[in-house]
Amino acid sequence: DFSSPEEELLHELDRQTHLQVVQPRMLSGHIQGKLLELLVRMLRPRNILEIGTFTGYSALCMAAGLEEDGVLDTVEVDDELEEFAASFFRRSPHGQKIRQHIGSALDIVPTLGYTFDLVFIDGDKREYPDYYRMLMGDGGSKVLVHSGSILIADNILWSGKIVEPVAHNDRHTQALLEFNRMIREDERVENVIVPIRDGLNLIRVK
């Protein structure tokens, strides 16, 4: 591996997630985390939104690339993960840039009062289409992104399930297929799917 090495705190977070948390594979991991950090450094956003904190790995990666006066709002529905993530945020030199929220992103995000320069979507896969509608202001709600905003949606290939026949009761895969079609057919954005890890959909608002 010729990529930059993983920071010690992130390595510990990865290890503790695997030791203590159910479904540790949901963690972004070193390569995807470094990609997120570099994208933040290159794009220089002021306001970042993350939907789906999990144990905080990706939030810390993005915060590392964020300017000192930048803010990262991260939303997690599982309150049992709150203190686990917060304990690592407190130990990071970038933790002061992170604002943690517990609850439904569909309820919390519209109350934050920002338009976002960068959004990382990694929450409930069944809600990806609703997250997108919320961000784009569909249905008459306030638009939460602007021209030039970047949206990054994780797990977009869903272990290859999106190219296989979908069971009628597989709501996760159905929602991801709907999301991918929404992006492809929406003339307000342009996108590319990057087959890193479980797939990233990189979306730019025109």
PLM feature spans:
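Class I SAM-dependent transferase core
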Residues: 1-49
